[in-house]
A protein has these predicted regions:
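Short, surface-exposed recognition loops and adjoining beta-strand edges that mediate ligand/DNA contacts
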Residues: 33, 60-78, 160-163, 198-214, ...
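Bacterial Sec-dependent N-terminal signal peptides
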Residues: 1-28
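Elongated scaffold/linker segments in the mid-to-C-terminal portions of large proteins
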Residues: 39-41, 46, 50-57, 73, ...
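Acidic, glycine-rich segments characteristic of secretory precursors and extracytoplasmic regions
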Residues: 19-67, 116, 180, 488, ...
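Conserved, well-structured interaction surfaces
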Residues: 43-57, 80-154, 177-184, 190-204, ...
Length: 498
């Protein structure tokens, strides 16, 4: 990765030296060496490890890399921005695509901030002995989360687990490491978090910070992702068992009795989302706040609404660009027969018009509390419905159909749908992964879900039949940005086909 993305503070310091080499000891200069002097300094840096989440292509527009890439959500105008938005659902990405470069760099920026924080945690003293380890636990969770997305989307990637000390260290680290090593780093970080004094679950005021249950969910998701990767077929049983252990532990720490006790809208409603008992980890935004508001609702809005009461924002004139709509009016996601009873369709899906044609859109990101373009809709990264449906996945992948249906039916019945019974084999698998698409539409999970549920051959045939004629074996990984490959062509070779 580019030097500026691995060690931004070091580069900034080097740049300062080169411009003013005669004044190297100015006591007023803030450098890596003298910035960390108080516990408050560390707290500020810890807050900064979360900031890259809000970069334009980390979580803010993650759906392009997940739901759109899986053709669950479609960008309907191929002419916008030179076709870059449309390239995801068309599977026509290149190594020069700016979204790919932005995402790759934003994730590594987040990882670098975590490494810098960990490096300097012992530079100061703390009022409470547990504070230091709490900060390290947060950094390790954020770092592990970044590596989960990198290994899932790019395959073998550079694995940087400490702050590089020199430019030579930076270039030495810019070498792709096997997926197995990356997954192990994720598990090691999650294990550290679980042994730390970090809270099991955060309060409403701190819901945007890491917690132990979030680490359990991440650990389970990574184990399940690795278990279903064809490279690790021989370890599938072992990895699924590890995933179940973490899922069981996460479920045991919930603050509610039954999933059906929580309304399907609680995780997303502006009034309830920050204190929702279903939410485990989320990216926080503040409605109407210039510095802390987000633009998420605008990425899912149609050009016009069939029902203005279901608009995503208060002032619909703020919206002008085409965005992500449910494919084929959501017919495959929400069957017509279920639409009058599925509470998710009734409460979280709306209809409108794009280009003169009817479309459906997700209403999970709605903020009518402000007339500004700074919205308060949080991005929910992990919630308990995910724990439930991953339990169903693990049960399916280990041949336990009865338990798979038990967990699957928890989500279906909460949504107002009938329980399933008597399913096995591919019918059970399809029921689980179709339910995941319905439950998490617009939440940035579909692509990883498809990879866990289906073989490369099945997905290739599916996407080609669905209209993605260009889809092929290369598309199971994103391209490494060209701007990174040229820094070390031998150590950072491009993924095949790009």
């Amino acid at each position: 990765m580019k030097l500026k993305y691995i060690i931004p503070i070091l580069v900034m310091a080097l740049g300062t030296v080169s411009c003013d080499f005669l004044d190297l000891s100015d006591p007023n200069k803030v450098t890596v060496g003298n910035f960390y002097q108080t516990e408050a300094d560390i707290a500020n840096v810890c807050a900064g490890i979360y900031q890259p989440f809000k970069d334009s292509h980390y979580f803010t527009r993650q759906d392009y890399f997940t739901d759109s890439y899986a053709r669950v959500l479609m960008f309907l105008d191929p002419g916008v921005a030179g076709g870059e938005n449309y390239a995801f659902c068309a599977h026509s990405l290149t190594n020069a695509h700016s979204f790919i470069s932005n995402r790759y760099n934003s994730i590594y920026k987040s990882i670098d901030r975590c490494n810098i924080l960990i490096k300097h945690l012992d530079d100061v003293t703390y009022e409470k002995a547990t504070t230091r380890d709490t900060y390290e636990a947060e950094a390790r969770f954020v770092r592990a989360l970044g590596y989960f997305y990198l290994v899932s989307e790019f395959g073998d990637v550079p694995l940087v687990l400490s702050k590089p000390g020199s430019i030579n260290d930076v270039y030495a680290a810019n070498v792709r490491q096997p997926k197995e090593k990356v997954y192990q780093a994720i598990y090691d970080d999650c294990a550290w978090v679980l042994a730390s004094p970090l809270a099991d679950l955060q309060s409403a005021n701190d819901c945007g910070r890491a917690c132990k249950v979030a680490a359990l969910v991440l650990d389970a998701k990574a184990h399940l992702q690795q278990a279903t990767d064809p490279v690790f077929t021989a370890r599938k049983a072992e990895l699924c068992a590890a995933a179940k252990t973490s899922l069981d532990a996460a479920w045991a720490k919930k603050f509610f009795n039954k999933l059906e006790d929580i309304n399907v809208t609680d995780a997303f409603d502006l009034e309830t989302q920050k204190g929702s008992k279903e939410n485990i980890f989320q990216i926080n935004y503040v409605s109407g706040d210039t510095n802390n508001g987000g633009s998420i609702p605008l990425y899912f809005a149609p050009q016009s609404y069939d029902d203005e009461s279901k608009s995503l924002v208060r002032d619909v004139s703020k919206y002008s660009s085409p965005c992500l709509m449910l494919k084929d009016k959501g017919d495959k996601i929400f069957p017509e027969a279920d639409r009058t009873k599925d509470l998710r369709f009734i409460n979280l899906i709306g209809s409108g018009i794009f280009g003169g044609s009817p479309v459906y859109y997700t209403r999970k990101y709605t903020d009518k509390a402000t007339t500004t373009v700074y919205y308060g809709s949080d991005i929910v990264v992990f919630r308990y419905a995910d724990v439930v449906l991953m339990q169903a996945e693990v049960a399916y992948h280990t041949g336990d159909a009865a338990n798979a249906m038990k967990w699957l039916n928890m989500v279906r019945q909460r949504a107002g749908l009938d329980a399933v019974s008597g399913l096995s084999g591919n019918n059970l698998r399809d029921a689980i992964y179709e339910e995941r698409i319905r439950e998490f539409v617009g939440e940035g999970k579909a692509w990883e879900d498809y990879l866990r549920g289906y073989s490369h051959e099945e997905l290739t045939n599916y996407f080609k039949a669905d209209g993605a004629a260009m889809f092929g074996e290369k598309d199971f990984l994103f391209p490494i940005p060209y701007s990174q490959v040229i820094l070390n062509p031998e150590g950072l070779p491009q993924n095949p086909g790009y």
